[in-house]
């Protein structure tokens, strides 16, 4: 059993003072009955709700987010960057201490684990862990067999040497280049074509801008980047950008291994 005001503070995302005010206002129910006493002891199997939402009384929560573009996932944003943080997407969960496991660049989308379990976060991001991360990239330029070989050999950067990575070319696209308007007396020219390549890449580290820098090494610029897997965990493609769900028990078990 646990005091009701403590339950609200631990699992409702509010302070003990706010919990007492919520109780006084009749906003809290236990098994469907309004309870106003902060000292009321709720059983472990009692259903406690705040403003009609049932509280999930778990110490740790684990979420799978399809990160949208434009959101930062760093716990220490760049000075002057007012972009929203991914944690703001979880404001209705009432969970304290949430943080993203690792980070994705602001313009990178896809799989991101969000939790309040610091031990798990450390295990997945520890330097010696080397959890595989797979991305779908759209790059400006064409990739070939030599690029695949270069990724497989690894790249030398100023601060680290990347481990061998797997690059798979999925598709080459031709798109019309955006050019300046032609003068009225100028004969129309056929539109120039620009090559883009869709590729899948799996890396073992997670350094700053690593995937983008690796493609720069082979003369290509990343224009879109989406993470689709991290270790044994795959992005749930039914989630729209900005949507999330709790990890399933088997998913949590797999990433704990």
What positions do the PLM features span?
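Basic, flexible Lys/Arg- and Gly-enriched helix-loop patches that mediate nucleic-acid binding at interfaces
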Residues: 1-257
């Amino acid at each position: 059993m646990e005091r009701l005001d403590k339950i609200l503070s631990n699992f409702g995302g509010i302070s003990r003072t706010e919990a007492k005010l919520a109780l006084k206002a009749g906003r809290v129910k236990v098994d469907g009955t309004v309870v106003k006493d902060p000292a009321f002891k709720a059983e472990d199997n009692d259903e406690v709700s705040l403003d009609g939402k049932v509280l999930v009384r778990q110490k740790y929560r684990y979420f799978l987010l399809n990160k949208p573009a434009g959101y930062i996932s760093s716990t220490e944003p760049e000075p002057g960057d007012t972009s929203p943080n991914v944690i703001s997407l979880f404001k209705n969960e009432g969970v304290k201490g949430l943080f993203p496991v690792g980070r994705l660049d602001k313009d990178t989308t896809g799989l991101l684990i969000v939790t309040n379990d610091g031990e798990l976060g450390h295990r997945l991001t520890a330097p010696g862990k080397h959890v595989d991360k797979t991305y779908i990239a759209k790059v400006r330029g064409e990739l070939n067999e030599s690029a695949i070989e270069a990724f497989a050999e690894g790249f030398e950067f100023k601060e680290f040497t990347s481990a061998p990575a797997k690059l798979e070319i999925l598709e080459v696209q031709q798109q019309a280049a955006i050019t300046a308007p032609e003068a009225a007396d100028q004969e129309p020219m056929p539109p120039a074509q620009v090559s883009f390549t869709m590729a899948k890449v799996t890396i073992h580290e997670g350094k700053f801008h690593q995937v983008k820098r690796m493609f720069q090494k082979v003369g290509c610029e990343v224009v879109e980047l989406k993470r689709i897997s991290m270790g044994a965990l795959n992005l749930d493609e039914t989630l729209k950008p900005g949507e999330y769900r709790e990890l399933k028990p088997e998913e949590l078990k797999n990433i704990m291994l």
